[in-house]
Amino acid sequence: MPENNIELAGNTNIKTSQVDKSVDTPADFTSPEVLYNKLIETIRQYHPSSDLSDIERAYKVAKEAHEGQFRKSGEPYIIHPLCVAIILAELELDKESIIAGLLHDVVEDTVMTSEDVAREFGDEVALLVDGVTKLTQLNYQHDKIEVQAENLRKMFLAMAKDIRVIMIKLADRLHNMRTMQYQSPAKQVEKSRETMDIYAPIAHRLGISKIKVELDDLSMKYLMPDTYNDLVKQVDINRPGREAVIKRIIKEVGMH
């Protein structure tokens, strides 16, 4: 990721794109501690006897690594990996996946290296983080020729030697789409198009309907805002019903 690095106290290099002091912390800001507790509670629901000491350690390492970094919303950056980890826990993934979710941006966006991750959490977690980093570096440019999107989807799947890498990347994209309102209109359209062309179809292929449907929903919100808003206002139906309508609209306009 070609960004200018800046030096902060403690010899921590961070990407300038992730520091936005002009943005106030949102009023509905949820503290990292609250999110961490939610993560632990979610894991306990499907793995009540699991030793979570490594997850706690990964959270502390990620929080320290991302210290001084902020999201476009003004929130501390650690909010993002925490939310990614929560999504993975909601899907009942294993401990290594959740640890990798907490650490998925440290190699790309902090001074931590893959070797650091391996030394602290083992080769398995390091390989997951490295896989997510490589997928993030895939260059996507929308083209109307469907075969190009299909080729990129195949490359995406082929590059991920472990299916958990894709799960982490899907969770990463889902949280980014959930917070897309803080991006510029151009970025909203770009990322929504990419999400609908690449990520939603991959989620569908993997049978993760929960993520696939929400990615479609959020993408449509920015790609077809008038249609989406009319749908929300005029169609007084439950969420599954709205999802069915969105699916039909996407099919009619030729989106994946």
Label every model-predicted segment.
Residues 1-256:
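Active-site helical microenvironments for divalent-metal-assisted chemistry
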